[in-house]
Amino acid sequence: MGWSYIILFLVATATDVHSQVQLQQPGAELVKPGASVQLSCKASGHTFTNYWIHWVKQRPGQGLEWIGEINPNDGRSNYNEKFKNKATLTVDKSSSTAYMQLSSLTPEEFAVYYCARSDGYYDWFVYWGQGTLVTFSA
């Protein structure tokens, strides 16, 4: 009977740790066409440097587009070819925050931008930020 309780405790603890993972993003950014914007993604509930952070774009009525990923431990990054000259990914380890700078914004960049993280074992994204809507001011 003792082993059952130990296993139950370990499962409950692991589930609780998973439920604590958060990726916090601002709700919206208002920018002028041609300007640049820096989006943030503050991680908590896990060791920031252990997991790659991904960025994903979604335009209204369209599917998801993977922009790129960054390794918070050493700053290595990989980009979708389409976004290589548009997005720049960086991290600040001291604040457990990932950033994506978008330059020379056009109406094409009117979209919601999500940061995401895998569970560390598989490639799909288990944890998502709430997304930041980039809208344009006149």
UniProtKB/Swiss-Prot annotation:
Positions of region (Framework-2): 55-68
Keywords tagged on the record: Adaptive immunity, Disulfide bond, Immunity, Immunoglobulin, Signal
GO BP term, example: immunoglobulin mediated immune response
Listed InterPro entries: Ig-like_dom, Ig-like_dom_sf, Ig-like_fold, Ig_sub, Ig_V-set, IgHV
Region (Complementarity-determining-1) location: 50-54
Alphabetical list of Gene3D superfamilies matching this protein: Immunoglobulins
Name of the featured protein: Ig heavy chain V region TEPC 1017
Source organism of this protein record: Mus musculus (Mouse)
